[in-house]
Structures are given as structure tokens and as C-alpha cells.
Amino acid sequence: MPKLNCFASLLILFGLFPKFSADGSERPNILWITSEDNNVNWVGCYGNPHAQTPHIDKLASEGFQYMNCFANAPVCAPSRSGWITGVHPVSLGTLPMRSRYDIPHQEIKYYPDYLKKVGYYCANVRKTDYNIGGRSDDDCWDSTKLEWKKLKQGMPFFQVINVASSHESRAFGEVDNTTHSPEDIQLAKYHPDIPTIRKNYAHYHDAVKRMDAEVGKFLKQLHQHGLSENTIVVYNSDHGGVLPRSKRHLFNSGTHCPLIIRIPEKFRAWWPAESPGSKIDRLVSFIDMPKTWLSLAGAEVPEVMQGKIFLGKGREAERPYHVSYRERMD
């Protein structure tokens, strides 16, 4: 076994990883669940009475529902390059889809690098797609598996779970035998009200329902393993979508994303409102997320990060605007 792994194992065994930050406050676990391609219009708690998302809706009732969260890019890889670095893709040169240009990795590290410095176990199951060359996408993660046993070993964890059931690819295929009724949809004004469109809406509602069930499964597992009371849960999608005029397009349909954050009672000082179940109007840009996660964890927040901390004791002034952008993409 490598020496570093032996040393880490001893630290875990004797409980010596820093569960408390420098100011004496307890470090939270963070579970970040992401889905793909669904904008707010596919989620019940955001106002669609036909959406079947009971687990996400329940999470919103237990947490804080952000009403104005926007992706910086309306497609996955550029969007995720901003997530992993905290730097705008237009600054990095990662905006063109599938380009994977190198960046100066010595100056621009990935946010899990900073989490691991303060004792976090960092895992991603499993979507990276960072569109960055010169470094393996998996290099910053301790694991690409969901291993509840390791998450219970005493060190704080940052666990990413990506649910792909709502990805654009799930919107294709047979649309004549859906469980969701084509009559029970909220049709966008820019789509014609014809049977084919209604069937495609119903088909994607089925995909979102499956995604919601997976979110519910992971939240149940978190509870069953006795980790809920120490874990901040974040749910959001990676950009908008998925029917025509959404994904890849710089409209709200391509960028306006659900964001729900459940914060345990022990961290109530970080609540953005008086009580869970509140709707939060603050404007949040995806570029704000990595900087905020580092702040919540009590980790170093590098100056190169361009976002605003929107939650916790390090919260910064609300951003006056958000910017989205796109370039070449498939």
C-alpha cells in the first residue's frame, strides 16, 4: 500500500482528521446530487402541477428552494468546467464544447484539491466531463464510487452523485406508450399544441420521474446510514433542457435551473431564511457554487475563483447580475 494511503488509514482509524475548522466550528458533510438537462419547468415545486417529482419536492419542503439559479453555459462540459475550477469558461478557454484545452493547472486547481487539504474525503459518482486538458478528470477525486462505509469513517466527506436519467438521450425513443398522460402537461408557448409534441413532453416527464426516484433512493440511503443530521444536501441540474429551444440555447429554458439546499438543524446559523421550506429569491450563478462549498467546509477560497459566496457565514453581497454564454457545441 502506498505510504500516503497508509498514513490516511491511520488518521481515519484514530479519528485524527480535522472534523472542526480553525475557528472551532464543526465541518459539515456535503452531498451534492446533480441531474442532467432538466430546467425548473420539469420540477413540481417550481410550479408545474403535472410534474411527478415527489422526492425533490419533499427536499424543498425540508430545505431552501432557490428561485433564481442560472447555469453559465447551456450545455454540460463548459458548465462543468466552471464548476470544477470556479473560473468562468470564457476566462479558461473551455467554452467550445469538446475542446479540452490545457489550462495553467499550477495556478488554477480544482475545488476538491482544497477540500482534501482540510481533511475531506471527496468522491464523485460519476460525471466529470470538465472539458479541460492536461489533467485527468478523476485526478482530484479520492473515489469514483459511492461507498457508504467509507463515508462513515469519521472524516468529513464531499460526495457528488450525478443522476443521468433525465439526460437528453432519455428524451428520444418510443413516445407512444408513456405512463405520463400526454393530456397532463404544461406546454411551453413556443411549442405547437399537437399530439407529437404532447407525447414527447409525456415521455420526458417519465424520464424526470425516474430521475426523481433515484434522488429519493440516495436520500433514503443517507438517512439509513445515520448521516442526515451532519450532511448538507444540495440538489440541482447542470443546465436547462431538454426539448427544442432549451439545451444549448441562451434562453431561460436552457439556463434556469432548480437549486435546493437542505441544511441540518446543527448548522442553522447558515440558514438563508427563518425556516426550512422557504423560497429564496437571491440570484445564484453556477460560478458561485465551488467558492460557496469551500467556504462552508472552512477550506481555503483561492483568489482566482470568480463567484460570490451565497450561503453560510462567509456569505458575500448578492451579485447584481448573472451572465450566460455559449460557443461551438455538438
Annotate each language-model stretch with its function.
Residues 8-18:
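Bacterial N-terminal signal peptides
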Residues 2-7, 20-330:
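Formylglycine-dependent sulfatase
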